[in-house]
Amino acid sequence: MSLTRVSVTAVRNLHPVTLSPSPRINILYGDNGSGKTSVLEAIHLLGLARSFRSARLQPVIQYEEAACTVFGQVMLANGIASNLGISRERQGEFTIRIDGQNARSAAQLAETLPLQLINPDSFRLLEGAPKIRRQFLDWGVFHVEPRFLPVWQRLQKALRQRNSWLRHGKLDPASQAAWDRELSLASDEIDAYRRSYIQALKPVFEETLAELVSLDDLTLSYYRGWDKDRDLQDVLASSLLRDQQMGHTQAGPQRADLRIRLAGHNAAEILSRGQQKLVVCALRIAQGHLINRAKRGQCVYLVDDLPSELDEQHRMALCRLLEDLGCQVFITCVDPQLLKDGWRTDTPVAMFHVEHGKVSQTTTIGSEA
């Protein structure tokens, strides 16, 4: 799976541009502030209908423009081309089109174009709140388990109903019990999918990490969000009074976490910034391998400022792992010489220079294997 064409209009400082990227490695280079990251942001918009740089829409849309648009053609794993498009307006409205038809949700984009982002904010996967690690986990499950999304939607609905009742007390006991049962059933299914995914992810992650850095004491464990020896419905019943006092449900898969520890301690508190980056990269590359194994296509990797925090040895090791995935990669950097020679001679590498928002292809190296 790869993007064969990307057209961008009115995204930040970028001039209107149509790119024909390599199916494998694409390096975008230029000075800081030139617009390199904005190219990755445009692709991210195309795949997820949102920016990774801003929760607000306004900064993404070019000054004095009413909307930004991104179109792309994706070559799917079955060899069929799919056309994607997204337009986002200043008022917040957005239109998603897939093969000429309006899409119902951003989930359809995500399924068609799986994206993995590695950028300076990726440290939050280790340092941030459990919600960030749940999102990482659920992204992986979503892309390998087609039954996950409808169950996750059931869970969210049941959780909203229960939390509303906890705050306002407007459900009769029978309705309350029914929603507790639904929440418990959906939670057990979500837990099973997550647990199965972690069991598959751990050995791939450990093997990938070993290629990057020696951290033998680093462990990955899963906490499901409630006592592993108790049924959730019992936990909900016993914690009802406290939940009412707090105004929300305190136990359940919405409290799950992926715990990353080194010698028994929170890894984020011990690892250097460079080591943290390598751990995050290993996690995201491992996810890519699982998607490949599930035969649901391949990820497209967006790697912002790959050289930062890494010495040459680790930089080259990371390039090799990305290359071995056999997927499409977009990488930004200031100095292209740091990455230009990190690939095999038969790997197609496209180089794009970005200057003051203008993107121009400068070189294509190698040929598709």
UniProtKB/Swiss-Prot annotation:
Pfam family, one: SMC_N
Source organism superkingdom: Bacteria
Subcellular location: Cytoplasm
Annotated PROSITE patterns: RECF_1, RECF_2
Keyword tRNA-binding: no
Gene Ontology CC terms: cytoplasm
Chief site of localization: cytoplasm
Single GO biological process annotation from the record: DNA replication
Positions bound to ATP: G30, D31, N32, G33, S34, G35, K36, T37
Key words, A-Z: ATP-binding, Cytoplasm, DNA damage, DNA repair, DNA replication, DNA-binding, Nucleotide-binding, SOS response
InterPro entries according to UniProt: DNA-binding_RecF, DNA-binding_RecF_CS, P-loop_NTPase, RecF/RecN/SMC_N, RecF_2
A GO molecular function held by the record: ATP binding
Family listed: Belongs to the RecF family.
Role description: The RecF protein is involved in DNA metabolism; it is required for DNA replication and normal SOS inducibility. RecF binds preferentially to single-stranded, linear DNA. It also seems to bind ATP.
Name used for this protein in its record: DNA replication and repair protein RecF
Natural source organism: Pseudomonas paraeruginosa (strain DSM 24068 / PA7) (Pseudomonas aeruginosa (strain PA7))
